[in-house]
């Protein structure tokens, strides 16, 4: 018999880190043509024999650090693994499919979405901000910008006061304070310093500063303190308008528009650009720590504090996984194929080490496991036009904004402990 052609059997050991699903650690002879479907049937039969529980569990199977997405024999051949050896297969309970929960209708394209607790903050091409509940109730429309809003982020939020920032094509960033009880909002500072539209914004982990990236190619850092006007050496020499905030730091290095910015820690920033590069900045040195060059414009990136990896979205329809700590060989760990147009937005889960979401100009969101490069776990459908932004800040909700003037809310059925903010 020829196991390599799918004829015959392969010796496997079935392992799991989820002890309540463990089966006896003995070699099992299985057909080389088995797929995830047949392996699930086989494994559930073993579990029924062990526990007597008739309920079926859906599992995914890791073979040499990658999810099985076809026949076992084909997977082993692709990785040049000998069929004579016993193969270790790790199985994990499949992450459940997020369910569509709501559609929040706006008056124009929704280009920015950020969730904190039960509140959804959105920014639109009609120059307005909006606040919604996670249950779809519209709370507030906030005018102020004079051009489309491109990015938003929360600074802080408690039962009484919410503070957040928004950036716009009008070249400004606005810092807002919202009284939750009275539902009154005011712009407490207008941040001026960029010379073109401000496409990206990110608040530091300690909520004391925020960073912005612009079409003027500049990265700027600002104070997020309630009463701090900021000001770097150059701008502090100019007289300040009342309520106007100036940057405390300006960093130059990109050659084209900065498309994304994210804090890695309180002294390190990640940026991506249309100039095909990704840069990691050391703010204590006020300079570039690492530069990664690619062959396409990068539209978005997300750094995970759980696995310390970066996933990027780019113009060639692909997502890529980078390890910025690698000094030798390729730092591209994987390429993820599945979208059919520009990938505009990407974000890691804040609680699930291997999961991230993406949104693209093919009108689709996708939920990925970084160990499954050949296919996403799920397609999250609903948008009728291109997806412009996606957010998974709250583990319970995946929210995306699009050119169909909607925010789509998907509920995750695996979200940990419920908090009072989510009720």
UniProtKB/Swiss-Prot annotation:
Sorted alphabetically, the keyword list is: Nucleus, Repeat, Ribosome biogenesis, rRNA processing, WD repeat
Q: Which Gene3D superfamilies match?
A: YVTN repeat-like/Quinoprotein amine dehydrogenase (2.130.10.10)
Molecular-function GO term, any one:
ribonucleoprotein complex binding
Database matches in InterPro entries: G-protein_beta_WD-40_rep, NLE, WD40/YVTN_repeat-like_dom_sf, WD40_repeat_CS, WD40_repeat_dom_sf, WD40_rpt, WDR12/Ytm1
**PANTHER family on file:** RIBOSOME BIOGENESIS PROTEIN WDR12, WD40 REPEAT PROTEIN 12, 37
Tell me what this protein is called. Answer: Ribosome biogenesis protein WDR12 homolog
The entry assigns this protein to a family as follows: Belongs to the WD repeat WDR12/YTM1 family.
- Top-rank taxon of the source lineage equals Eukaryota
Where is this protein found? Nucleus, Nucleolus; Nucleus, Nucleoplasm
Listed under GO biological process in this entry are: maturation of 5.8S rRNA from tricistronic rRNA transcript (SSU-rRNA, 5.8S rRNA, LSU-rRNA); maturation of LSU-rRNA from tricistronic rRNA transcript (SSU-rRNA, 5.8S rRNA, LSU-rRNA)
